[in-house]
């Protein structure tokens, strides 16, 4: 289990908790003449300390089973041989009890990373296909962090730099856009992106400084979308390792919507409102600080990290990430939107 550091009480009181019932539906469109359809559908994770999952039910028209991917995340696998219909649905329903994650993020309690720490978490220091570590990233990370060896202080410097130098695309949707894959290179070049672009850049910088980092994929459970049968998108955040404190979360992407002044108008207001956990936004230094080391309770975790190998192994290359699903038809990737769609509905208990 990923034991992200959290405290039951601190100066702000007890941890907030929330209970949700969710319905996650995947509709797969089947091309004419398809001989084999393979589906890997993200499941709510039972290895996240802030998330308790119960009552999982699966409805599917073909044989299926629960597997784990190369990062240990549970995945529903389904295989359809010689399907005759034009499409089929896979539905999961479950209950999630979420708790807020709150940590002290006290630099005085953190210790410098040792060679043994870096050996233990070596895989979380490596680049991914779209989370690059190159000379440009190393130079920039050195400029931002300098000689700081305290991982919490170094991580906060990187967090603040990203907030000061990158803007979430929803702030200016007419002129900015996200990359289609979640890319360090894109985010650094265009100084914008979505949550995956933000976290890719931050992760590249942190790993370049020897700080083990993971990217966590989930969904916000937004009050405005309660009970609505639609995709509801996904959200991701990061965790970094600090000896003496353990794995600590941050959400630099959503923090950006509370960082500084920016115009709100008819073009961006709804997008901005639907990008945060509770629909609030605008300058709020306390929220910016909160999302370094803390997470709200209005989210569910689907998977972890990038460049995934499925079980059973997919025919295509490593899967970029699994916030929703991955589908292959006759050995080739079947793309989202044209090949399949996901709908997520929830109610709060």
Predicted regions and their residues:
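Terminal peptide-recognition signature
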Residues: 39, 158, 238
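Acidic low-complexity segments
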Residues: 68-70, 89-169, 176-185, 189
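Intrinsically disordered, low-complexity N-terminal segments that are enriched in acidic
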Residues: 2-102
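Secretory-pathway-linked proteins and extracytosolic
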Residues: 80-132, 292, 296-298, 306-349
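Active-site nucleophilic cysteine motif
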Residues: 151-158, 191-206
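A short, structured loop/turn motif at beta-sheet edges
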Residues: 32-34, 83-88, 149, 207-209, ...
């Amino acid at each position: 289990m990923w034991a992200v550091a959290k405290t039951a009480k601190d100066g702000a009181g007890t941890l907030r908790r929330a209970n949700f019932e969710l319905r996650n539906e995947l509709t797969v469109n089947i091309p004419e003449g398809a001989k084999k359809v393979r589906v890997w559908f993200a499941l709510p994770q039972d290895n996240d300390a802030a998330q308790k999952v119960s009552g999982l039910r699966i409805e599917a028209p073909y044989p299926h089973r629960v597997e784990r991917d190369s990062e240990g995340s549970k995945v529903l696998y389904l295989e359809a041989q010689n399907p005759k219909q034009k499409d089929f649905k896979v539905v999961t329903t479950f209950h999630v009890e979420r708790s807020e994650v709150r940590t002290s993020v006290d630099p005085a309690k953190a210790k410098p990373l040792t060679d043994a720490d870096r050996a233990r978490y070596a895989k979380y220091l490596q680049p991914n296909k779209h989370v690059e570590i190159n000379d440009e990233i190393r130079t920039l990370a050195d400029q931002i962090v300098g000689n700081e060896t305290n991982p919490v202080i170094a991580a906060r410097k990187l967090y603040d730099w990203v907030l000061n130098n990158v803007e979430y695309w929803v702030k200016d949707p007419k002129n900015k856009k996200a990359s289609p894959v979640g890319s360090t290179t894109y985010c650094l070049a265009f100084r914008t992106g979505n949550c995956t672009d933000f976290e890719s850049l931050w992760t590249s910088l942190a790993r370049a400084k020897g700080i083990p980092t993971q990217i966590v994929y989930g969904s916000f459970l937004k009050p405005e979308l309660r009970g609505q049968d639609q995709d509801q998108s996904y959200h991701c955040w990061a965790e970094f390792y600090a000896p003496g404190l353990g794995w600590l979360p941050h959400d630099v992407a959503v923090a950006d919507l509370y960082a500084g002044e920016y115009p709100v108008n008819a073009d961006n207001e709804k997008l901005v409102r639907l990008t945060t956990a509770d629909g609030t936004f605008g300058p709020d230094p306390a929220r910016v600080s909160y999302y370094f080391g803390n997470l709200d309770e209005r989210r569910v975790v689907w998977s972890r990290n990038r460049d995934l190998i499925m079980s059973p192994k997919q025919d295509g290359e490593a899967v970029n990430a699994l916030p929703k699903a991955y589908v292959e038809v006759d050995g080739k990737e079947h793309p989202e939107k044209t090949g399949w769609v996901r709908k997520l509905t929830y109610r709060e208990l």
